[in-house]
């Protein structure tokens, strides 16, 4: 048995390993036998078959050992309380290998824009082969106010409402497309039976802020003014919904139309929205570092990169590091009464401020060049809805937040400010959910969120 094993290793590794390791097992005379054995021992087909089979098994076992060792080294366990943990553990690992590790290499070679192209390619892969829409839904590609849109029209049998839902997809203003949300849109339509229009706004960095804002506004105005007749819905019953960066655009859109005294939007639904870019050391950001640091779930560096690409600022590694350390703000601005009150962590639920998850931090000294450019942009409510001084008169809102999400706290702060200004606001928090769960197929948590959204729309639109 030992002889067969040694001959197999000789076939796989050659004389180098034979001379380096086998002296511990065999004297020189017997090693010589194995060195010539390759040329003289295997004379028959059966002997060659056994040798090749042994070599194949050895290679297979070595590859298995290598893969197991690699997985063991790279494995980052997800928190026990997170939903869809087994599926997410595999998806997170694959995305981390491709988008994070390979992404770092691509960024080194081709810069942050090249990395963004890689991310777009990777997120598109699961949607290359898409299933046909259900028989009760017609999907059309339309151009509305010069902007591409994906329109979902229910059949006569499925149509339960004359209202319409405008959806603004997420993806950090830089990635994702409306068709990636087909599954969620079909599931939602089955519940509410209304027309859905998903806006395919132009992505950054090809265009920068505020192009996406302006395109979404143009689409909603056109739907209200004229396109409603073509798609068969009541122009006085329009709701707008967005997730992540789409939630940001939805909140901004509601504020802009209110400022123009246009009562177009009757309800706004914000799903784990981006609300401000002031604080990258909030309790929810700190929770990432403490509980799932290094994973490919939405992380501080990705969020900082999205902001920089969206705003047309240099997305260098140095700038990313400065933003995640809150050095994109001057200490004077951070400590100003208005900003300090707006970002006060004590407004958050006490369970998010426990010392195992959170440590209050002093405002660092800001980077002069970066803060001068960033502060002017962050003070614009078209980027940071939280800075708006007057929110009264906005359409009633539903805000959904997730327990495992760096954006959790800004969504909660916006809920508090909306309520403070008299805006009827329903807050639904999902402690086990993670950022991006709307795109997780066969998820009980996604099902619950869609059920809650559908119930809210049926009752209020």
Predicted feature descriptions by range:
Residues 9-25, 30-82, 105, 109, ...:
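Alpha/beta-hydrolase superfamily serine-hydrolase fold, recognizing
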Residues 78-142:
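An N-terminal hydrophobic leader/cap segment in hydrolases
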């Amino acid at each position: 048995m030992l002889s067969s094993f040694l001959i197999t290793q000789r076939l796989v590794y050659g004389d180098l390993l034979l001379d380096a390791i086998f002296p511990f097992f065999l004297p020189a005379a017997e090693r010589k036998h194995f060195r010539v054995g390759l040329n003289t021992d295997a004379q028959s087909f059966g002997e060659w078959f056994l040798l090749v089979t042994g070599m194949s098994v050895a290679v297979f076992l070595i590859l298995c050992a290598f893969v197991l060792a690699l997985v063991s080294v790279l494995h980052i366990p997800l928190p026990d309380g997170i939903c869809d943990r087994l599926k997410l553990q595999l998806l997170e690992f694959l995305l981390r290998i491709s988008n994070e590790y390979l992404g770092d290499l691509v960024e080194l070679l081709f810069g942050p824009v090249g990395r963004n192209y890689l991310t777009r390619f990777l997120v598109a892969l699961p949607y290359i082969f898409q299933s046909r829409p259900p028989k009760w839904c017609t999907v059309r590609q339309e151009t509305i106010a010069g902007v591409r849109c994906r329109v979902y029209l229910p059949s006569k049998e499925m149509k339960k409402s004359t209202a319409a839902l405008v959806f603004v997809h997420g993806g950090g203003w830089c990635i994702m497309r409306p068709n990636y949300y087909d599954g969620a849109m079909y599931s939602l339509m089955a519940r509410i039976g209304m027309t859905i229009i998903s806006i395919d706004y132009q992505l950054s960095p090809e265009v920068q802020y505020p192009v996406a804002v302006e395109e979404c506004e143009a689409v909603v105005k056109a739907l209200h003014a004229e396109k409603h007749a073509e798609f068969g819905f009541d122009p006085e019953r329009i709701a707008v919904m967005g997730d992540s960066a789409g939630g940001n655009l939805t909140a901004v859109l509601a504020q802009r139309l209110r400022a123009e005294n246009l009562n177009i939007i009757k309800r706004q639904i914000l799903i784990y929205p981006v609300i401000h870019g002031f604080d990258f050391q909030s309790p929810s950001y700190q929770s990432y570092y403490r509980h799932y640091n290094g994973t490919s779930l939405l992380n501080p560096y990705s969020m900082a990169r999205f902001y920089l690409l969206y705003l047309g600022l240099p997305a260098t590694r140095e700038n990313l590091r400065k933003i995640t350390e809150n050095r994109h703000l001057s200490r004077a601005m951070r400590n100003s009464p208005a900003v300090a009150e707006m970002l006060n962590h004590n407004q958050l639920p006490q369970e998010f401020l426990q010392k195992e998850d959170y440590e209050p931090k002093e405002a660092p000294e800001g980077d002069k060049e970066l803060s001068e450019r960033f502060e002017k942009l962050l003070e614009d409510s078209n980027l940071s809805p939280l800075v708006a001084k007057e929110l009264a008169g906005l359409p009633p809102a539903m805000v959904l937040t997730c327990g495992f999400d760096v954006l959790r706290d800004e969504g909660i702060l916006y809920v508090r400010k909306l309520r403070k200004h008299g805006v009827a606001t329903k807050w639904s928090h999902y402690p086990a959910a993670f950022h991006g769960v709307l795109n997780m197929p066969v998820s009980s948590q996604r099902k619950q969120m869609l059920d809650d959204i559908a119930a809210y729309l049926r009752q209020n639109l």
